[in-house]
Swiss-Prot record:
Domain of life (superkingdom): Eukaryota
EC numbers on record: 1.4.3.5
One Pfam family this sequence matches: PNP_phzG_C
Protein name per UniProt: Putative pyridoxamine 5'-phosphate oxidase
Natural source organism: Caenorhabditis elegans
Amino acid sequence: METPSIDIQNIRAKYLNSHDPYLLESKLPTTSPFELFDIWFRNVASQSDLTFEEINAVSLSTVGKDLRPSSRMVLLKAYTPTGFSFYTNYTSRKGNQLEENPNAAMLFYWPKVNRQIRVEGVVEKLPDEMAVAYWNSRPVASRIGSKSSDQSKVVPDREFLESKKVALTELSVREGAQAITKPESWGGYHLIPRYFEFWQGQSDRLHDRIVFERDVDVWLLKRLSP
């Protein structure tokens, strides 16, 4: 495979942070990483078209007992002062890896504001009643899509999935959306952080990296060289 004609080596974007040009310890609005995440998330939300931009999309990295890491994008569905929640299939590759090893990492990247946030911690399953409540709040088309797919399992072709979708759609028409119940293998996870890294890009590549690391019951703050 040949390198594309695009000059990849010389792609260098200009980073513009007009409101907060530098991430300085003396000017942090809070010493809580959860509060700083909230501030940054609200900031990018205020500058985004949420109809087309999924600012809650996050790269989730997991490692099973075979020590082979894997990453994929998932959608963050809630964040609280204790951590970050998402929903998926428990028998998917990520679900199996989390069962074997609950340590995981998240990476949020928002190029519009030249910022990214890394979060590392331990993942726990959310209570099933929370998963049921969220499942029932979803559009019926989303429920049908999720229930049509035994995530990460090999299927013969797309028609196999489409036939399951058609059957479930017909069921929902006959009996209502409540007939599309949550599968036992589907539920939520909550990542409880022990490490945050807030990164703000700079055009001269002297980027800002501020870390919060959990030490018993306090967060230690430090700056890393870019």
